[in-house]
Amino acid sequence: MARLVALILAVVVAVAVLDLAQAEEQPQCARRGRSAPHRPHSVTITEFGAVGDGVTLNTVPFQNAVFYLRSFADKGGAQLYVPKGRWLTGSFNLTSHLTLFLEAGAVILGAQEVSQWPVVEPLPSYGQGIDLPGPRHSSLINGQSLTDVVITGNNGIIDGQGLTWWNWFRSNKLNYSRPHLVEFVDSKEIVISNLTFLNSPAWSIHPVYCSNVMVHNITIQTSLDAPLIDGIVPDSCSNVCIEDSSITVSHDAISLKSGWDNYGITFGMPTSDIHIRRVNLQSSLGAALSFGSEMSGGISDVHVDHLHIRGSTKGIFFKTAQGRGGYIRDAVISDVEMEDVGVAIAFTGDWSTHPGDHFDPTALPVISGITLKNMVGKNISVAGVLSGITGDPFTNICLSNINISLADSANSTSWFCSNISGYSELVFPEPCLDLHNPSNSSSCLSLPSYHAVAVA
């Protein structure tokens, strides 16, 4: 009997070890849960005096509701339910173990009065706001040092009503940098799903210093002529999954960042283990997918596949500058369809905006180990513009199985390269000689297959 028990225990342990090993081999998107956690306690925003007429200001009801729900954090968490209606509010903070749920027809509207958007200190990895030196306005929905937060619904809407902010930006009437729509700082286990985000004053979704972030089945839209509106911006984050979403903005649709010049170098928190798949992207004035230019903490271990990019100034854009320091390395982008794009693939080492004059010009970035493969482009103006830094070339840039059909009006020289080295195979039009180095072929990375992974 003792031998039988020992044998059973050995089998159980072996199975557990195998399951753990298989789980660790699965990409981040497969390991994340898709369903919102059960919350044993739920309240409706109307219980706190909110009125969904699109006119009544509901900042205090939202703040009071979250304050009340804090008491349930150690009791299984709670849900704040927002029913159908137009709920005008200023900035408010969330709490841990909370689900913010927007029913179909529910619209959270950002207030137009600047007093409803408090001023907060700049992020330490930036040293200033995105628009101006000094402090910045708090985002509409905020999370600071939180755990286990879900923002979801039945395709409810969060509308920043950003036109007022855009006009202030254009007319140089801002006193502080514009707010974002949703921002989580120093938080973990964040899920954002099944919602539409409209008209952010600046960036739409900004997780910064966060880990275990899941964004799926969302839509982001803004006016295509709005000033510098980004979609999703993972910033000094780890273990991030973005999938099954559609983003249409004026600037970068998805932008990976990690701090700005000496502030980012000193803070030293990289962005890593990023998985992006099955997303539709459009950027009228920027890039569909960008890396940097604020990347001073480093960006690595990025896996992107099954992108559809349309109507964008640039398709995939790696941007940095002298003074940034940091690195972008070990990124694989695969299975991309592009149409009506200005420049399909772009690298630049001259994106020279700095948060002040005190940056170190000797802090040179390292860009290496970037693979782009299995790409098709239609009606593309320029196949690629790849420009590194003199004395600091970008290396191990690998292109494979890429076919780009140029627009009739395209420049007859389809590739422009300088201070770049790498390898290419099965690429049309034929790329620059800088990308014909066979010694780089062994450095090209491969993308793990997602197809055999069961998704919960």
Question: Would you name each region that the model predicts?
Answer:
Residues A2-A456:
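Extracellular/periplasmic carbohydrate-active domains that bind, remodel
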